Structure formats: structure tokens, C-alpha cells
Amino acid sequence: MRVLGIDPGLRNMGWGVIDVSGTRLAHVANGICHSDSGDLAQRLLSLHGQLTDVLARFQPDTAAVEHTFVNKDGVATLKLGQARGIALLVPAQAGLAVGEYAPNAVKKTVVGVGHAAKEQIQHMVRLHLPGVALAGPDAADALAVAICHAHHVQSSGRLEAALARAAR
């Protein structure tokens, strides 16, 4: 299974692709979609195009997006929410199921604690994906989202199998 993880952002939208085979995770690629300052509609269009290119190039089977947090600046929060909409829309347009995870859930899955620092996330992503060259903190976060989704899908599959066995 190939998983695309997305860390939404208006200026820098991180993405990471991993392959999952059983409990084995393998890094495929990671990067950052950038948008320049200026007209919001053009920035969103740019992010849409870049993320669409990532999907076309790497052909993921599923995707996952990190929830955004609300901060004191309402305008910034709304703009971030619009970028997150692009992060949800592009994989959905490609027919993919899209998982959504809170930042604390991602950190808890990858690092072991829900309030981990960026450096801890990057360190643990490197441990999960040996040899990975991270394009930046946003790409590391996106890979962490992909790892979280892979673990969640595996756990859900094991639970469904156990319930099916118990029902027999």
C-alpha cells in the first residue's frame, strides 16, 4: 500500500509518500509545495496544481491529512483552513480515501508522546525510514502523518479480522 501524508500549509504544504508492506515502511519521496505571497486564490490554485502533480507522479493508494489548529489570529486560521481544503480535495478528486489525524495523535503514534517537538518528530521519522533525506520540517511532518495513517490502517485491519473470527 502506498500512502501519501500531507501537512497542510498556505506557504509550505509538506507531503511525504511511503510504501507499506506488512509492518515494513519504506520511504518513497517527500517534498514541499510552495506558494508565494499574493492573491489567495492564485496561491490555492498553485498548491492544487503542485499537489495534483505529486499524486500523478507517485500514484498513492490512500492519503492522510493532519488537522489544523485554531490560533488567536482568525484570518490566518481561515487561510490555513482553505489550504487544508486543497489538501483534502486533491486526493479525494483522485478517488482516494483520506484519513484525518490530530497533530497530537500523529506525534503520539510516531514519537510516543503527544506534545513532541519538531526535532523529535524529525528524529523519529528518520528512525522509521532509515536513510531518508528530509526536504524540511513540513515534509517530516507529512511523513509522520503517513506513518500514523499506516499504523491506523494496520490496526483497523487487525481489529476487523479479530471481530470476524469472533463472530464465527
Swiss-Prot record:
Cofactor: Mg(2+)
Primary gene name: ruvC
CDD domains assigned to the protein according to its UniProt record, in alphabetical order: RuvC (cd16962)
Protein name: Crossover junction endodeoxyribonuclease RuvC
Catalytic reaction equation(s): Endonucleolytic cleavage at a junction such as a reciprocal single-stranded crossover between two homologous DNA duplexes (Holliday junction)
Job description of the protein: The RuvA-RuvB-RuvC complex processes Holliday junction (HJ) DNA during genetic recombination and DNA repair. Endonuclease that resolves HJ intermediates. Cleaves cruciform DNA by making single-stranded nicks across the HJ at symmetrical positions within the homologous arms, yielding a 5'-phosphate and a 3'-hydroxyl group; requires a central core of homology in the junction. The consensus cleavage sequence is 5'-(A/T)TT(C/G)-3'. Cleavage occurs on the 3'-side of the TT dinucleotide at the point of strand exchange.
GO CC aspect terms: cytoplasm; Holliday junction resolvase complex
Alphabetical GO biological process terms: DNA recombination; DNA repair
EC number(s) recorded for this UniProt protein: 3.1.21.10
Manner of cofactor binding, per the entry note: Binds 2 Mg(2+) ion per subunit.
Family statement: Belongs to the RuvC family.
Organism expressing this protein natively: Cereibacter sphaeroides (strain ATCC 17029 / ATH 2.4.9) (Rhodobacter sphaeroides)
Pfam families referenced in this protein's UniProt entry, alphabetically: RuvC
